[in-house]
Amino acid sequence: MDVLGFICAVFLGTVVLHAKPTVRKDRVLYQDPELLRQATNEDNNSFQYDHEVFLGKEESKTFDQLSPEESKDRLSKIVDRIDGDGNSYITTDELKAWIKRVQKRYVYENVVKVWADYDLNKDNKISWEEYKQATYGYYLSNPEEFDETTDQFSFKKMLPRDERRFKRADLDGDSAANREEFTSFLHPEEFEHMKDIVVLETLEDIDKNSDGHVDEDEYIADMFAHEDRGPEPEWVKTEREQFSDFRDLNKDGKMDLDEIRHWIMPQDYDHAQAEARHLVYESDKDKDQMLTKEEILDNWNMFVGSQATNYGEDLTRNHDEL
């Protein structure tokens, strides 16, 4: 039984299940916005890039529902919130602080949305047993219905992996997660004590021969399925060069855990700072290194499509919610 069949069985009433294993496909946690922007602009597709990177594919639909007038009006109110000192100028630091606040709010609001799906006994904690039942209960009761050879992310493999992550998040060791611990379980990339787990899971996802390393072919296979056996696209050739020049730091032909960490969590890189600088650079008409509300509204399309508007959600919230 594949994952689709499993989901169908759930909705037919066999079991009520709202949860899913903690699978992540996006590897690099702190992408350089400028490098992504350059790659997209080469395809003359920068508007789509703004929507998908800053809004997300699904969240971009929210932006489409707003008229330019509505967007500008609501963005104007957001600018007032960003202007922490009330001097009518938005600095890079203020934008950076806002972007980080928005990201943090997104993480915690996501936990609020799913909390009831896991806290089965309503004691305001989620035990490992509760999480396991909510996520893997059907599989554990009906293992014969699952084809472990074809499921991309087999439940048999994901269960012990989730348990390992849960134990790392459970700082007080009581086998139950409070809200902060459960947040670190669902969003380990946001917590320093969980980042080793993120690196290890990345290795396990890509290391198909289980030798404890990621070689060049495994690195490429994670992003490109060479099904037609034809020539590789240019971007794949570029990624091979990236692997050789920047991923494989010790030049032994493969990546170890430290090199994987350097790849997905580059040191001394602040994504919020980079994004804030980009927004200022693109909107600062008088080049005084600060933005006025007028400058922001004149370039409102960029801010709608940026993390400064919480992937579009802030533009559909009431001002009092912000």
Swiss-Prot record:
Q: Any idea which positions bind Ca(2+) 4?
A: D207, N209, D211, H213, E218
| Compartments in which it is found | Endoplasmic reticulum lumen
Please name the GO terms that the record assigns under molecular function: calcium ion binding
Q: What residues does Ca(2+) 6 bind to? A: D284, D286, D288, M290, E295
Q: Which residues bind Ca(2+) 5?
A: D248, N250, D252, K254, E259
Q: Name one Pfam family in it.
A: EF-hand_7
Assigned keywords, A-Z? Calcium, Endoplasmic reticulum, Glycoprotein, Metal-binding, Repeat, Signal
User: What positions does the domain EF-hand occupy?
Assistant: 70-105, 106-141, 157-192, 194-229, 235-270, 271-306
Q: A cellular component term (GO) from this record?
A: endoplasmic reticulum lumen
Q: Where does Ca(2+) 2 bind?
A: D119, N121, D123, K125, E130
Question: Per UniProt, where does Ca(2+) 3 bind?
Answer: D170, D172, D174, E181
Q: Which residues are involved in binding Ca(2+) 1?
A: D83, D85, N87, Y89, E94
Signal sequence, start to end: 1-19
Q: Which residues are tagged as glycosylated in the record?
A: N44
Main localization is endoplasmic reticulum
Task: Note whether Endoplasmic reticulum occurs among the keywords.
Answer: yes
Q: Where is this motif: Prevents secretion from ER?
A: 319-322
Query: According to its UniProt record, which protein family does this protein belong to?
Result: Belongs to the CREC family.
Entry's PANTHER family? RETICULOCALBIN (PTHR10827), RETICULOCALBIN-1 (PTHR10827:SF17)
Protein role: May regulate calcium-dependent activities in the endoplasmic reticulum lumen or post-ER compartment.
Question: This protein is called what?
Answer: Reticulocalbin-1
> From which source organism is this entry?
Takifugu rubripes
